[in-house]
UniProtKB/Swiss-Prot annotation:
GO terms of biological process kind: photorespiration; reductive pentose-phosphate cycle
Cofactor note: Binds 1 Mg(2+) ion per subunit.
Description of post-translational modifications: The disulfide bond which can form in the large chain dimeric partners within the hexadecamer appears to be associated with oxidative stress and protein turnover.
Pfam families: RuBisCO_large, RuBisCO_large_N
Gene: rbcL
Protein name per the record: Ribulose bisphosphate carboxylase large chain
Modified residues (N6-carboxylysine): K201
Binding site for substrate: N123, T173, K177, R295, H327, S379
Residue numbers of N-acetylproline PTMs: P3
Amino-acid positions noted as binding Mg(2+) in the UniProt annotation, renumbered to this chain: K201, D203, E204
Sites annotated Transition state stabilizer: K334
Required co-factors: Mg(2+)
Phylogenetic classification of the source organism: Eukaryota, Viridiplantae, Streptophyta, Embryophyta, Tracheophyta
Location relative to the cell: Plastid, Chloroplast
Length: 475
């Protein structure tokens, strides 16, 4: 080492470990309109001050590492570092805090959810100084939002493609989810669509297994769809699951779906990955396909209250990455979903501008500028008695998806679809006449069942089915 180098080292660099809070805790920082803002629920290890914990999150998810390094002097850390700018104790919780972190926009590649998540929810979640860490919300600034295509088409374009307005759309997941041959699968699709449903759906588990290869399924489902359309005069769709082991295979399946002329395909966006999902979303926009998104694996990430990532963040990420539908819980069915919180992220999916509202778990005002909206899908353990509540909770721009609630009808698949369609039309008519669905829902269904034997049979089968468990995802 030359004497000149030694002199520079002694002046410009001091080795050792520094407290994160000296650099990354900046309570006087005024956030910029271009910053990505994050709200983390932080549970520090005993003895770790909240300021140090919040600063550690900001550091490890941006420019920091565990020790001072030579190359810090070769860039401007003040320009690129994340900053913990506010800390709030969580009411009713001991040693737990909401730490707000601001990230400069230049830290992230344009149009890449993958890159954004690699930083913000990357290695920092394994940091030893923290007992637990959960990302509660993100504010995506318009400057970053505009670098994404977003959903292939959006709510209004889908309505226009289907020529269906003024009511929720109806769907059904084909059951049993695994084991049917392609021809029997197509038969179930036809019966459900003929009975009055708008969509049927591949289960997320269905890709291309030995009992039913994807090409056979696509062919029989397309035949079923066209036959049902010819008989009902309505445009129908089946969510053909294009999820595959490689992006190339996924696109091959999407191309075949387009060649068949079907209106919609499907992707499991978490198990498939954001890079694959964005790739498929771009293909769907370019080729006129709607894109249905399933959220398989989300509960691994979002169900624990103290660690992981809230679904509202995954919902925002999906709106950026691209999808025209996404499953969003039901509030009333068998799957997790507390009402105010669910409606909070439903608004984040559909609306152009959403104000901060902590009572619904929304930590930041979100402006989506020109990104189209996503239709929420209510699915999981729902049946005809739930129809008034679902119509009231989710409104018209939604898909109400009944799997067992269609195929479990005692008279068969088509009568099950008829029962759901009659129940929906009755609820929409009652709402439009000014009736209170929340208070009069059961009576509305009983009245409709008097002139629909299919609905009456469904009401009798599911009159005592309830899923009354407390939601784990509370504020």
């Amino acid at each position: 080492m030359s004497p000149q180098t030694e002199t520079k080292a002694s002046v410009g660099f001091k080795a050792g470990v520094k407290d994160y809070k000296l650099t990354y805790y900046t309570p006087d920082y005024v956030t910029k309109d271009t910053d990505i803002l994050a709200a983390f629920r932080v549970t520090p290890q005993p003895g770790v001050p909240p300021e140090e914990a919040g600063a550690a999150v900001a550091a490890e998810s941006s420019t920091g590492t565990w020790t001072a390094v030579w190359t810090d002097g070769l860039t401007s850390l003040d320009r690129y570092k994340g900053r913990c700018y506010n800390i709030e104790p969580v009411a009713g919780e001991e040693n737990q805090y909401i730490c707000y972190v601001a990230y400069p926009l230049d830290l992230f590649e344009e149009g890449s959810v993958t890159n954004m998540f690699t930083s913000i929810v990357g290695n920092v979640f394994g940091f030893k100084a923290l007992r637990a860490l959960r990302l509660e919300d993100l504010r995506i600034p318009p400057a970053y939002t505009k670098t994404f295509q977003g959903p292939p088409h959006g709510i209004q374009v889908e309505r226009d493609k289907l020529n269906k307005y003024g009511r929720p759309l109806l769907g059904c997941t084909i059951k049993p989810k695994l084991g049917l041959s392609a021809k029997n699968y197509g038969r179930a699709v036809y019966e459900c669509l003929r009975g009055g449903l708008d969509f049927t759906k591949d289960d997320e588990n269905v890709n291309s297994q030995p009992f039913m290869r994807w090409r056979d399924r696509f062919l029989f489902c397309a035949e079923a769809l066209y036959k049902a359309q010819a008989e009902t005069g309505e445009i129908k769709g089946h969510y053909l699951n294009a999820t595959a082991g490689t992006c190339e295979e996924m696109l091959k399946r999407a191309v075949f779906a387009r060649e068949l002329g079907v209106p919609i395909v499907m992707h499991d966006y978490l198990t498939g990955g954001f890079t694959a999902n964005t790739t498929l979303a771009h293909y769907c926009r370019d080729n006129g396909l709607l894109l249905h998104i399933h959220r398989a694996m989300h509960a691994v990430i979002d169900r624990q209250k103290n660690h992981g990532m809230h679904f509202r963040v995954l919902a925002k990420a999906l709106r950026l990455s691209g999808g025209d539908h996404i499953h969003a819980g039901t509030v009333v069915g068998k799957l997790e979903g507390e009402r105010d919180i669910t409606l909070g992220f439903v608004d984040l999916l559909r609306d152009d501008f959403v104000e901060k509202d902590r009572s619904r778990g929304i930590y930041f005002t979100q402006d989506w500028v020109s990104i189209p909206g996503v239709i929420p899908v209510a699915s999981g353990g729902i049946h005809v008695w739930h129809m008034p509540a679902l119509t009231e909770i989710f409104g018209d721009d939604s898909v109400l998806q009944f799997g067992g609630g269609t195929l479990g009808h005692p008279w068969g698949n088509a009568p099950g679809a008829v029962a759901n369609r009659v129940a929906l039309e009755a609820c929409v008519q009652a709402r439009n006449e000014g009736r209170d669905l929340a208070r009069e829902g059961n009576e509305i269904i009983r009245e409709a069942s008097k002139w629909s034997p299919e609905l009456a049979a469904a009401c009798e089968v599911w009159k005592s089915i309830k899923f009354e468990f407390a939601a784990m995802d509370t504020l």
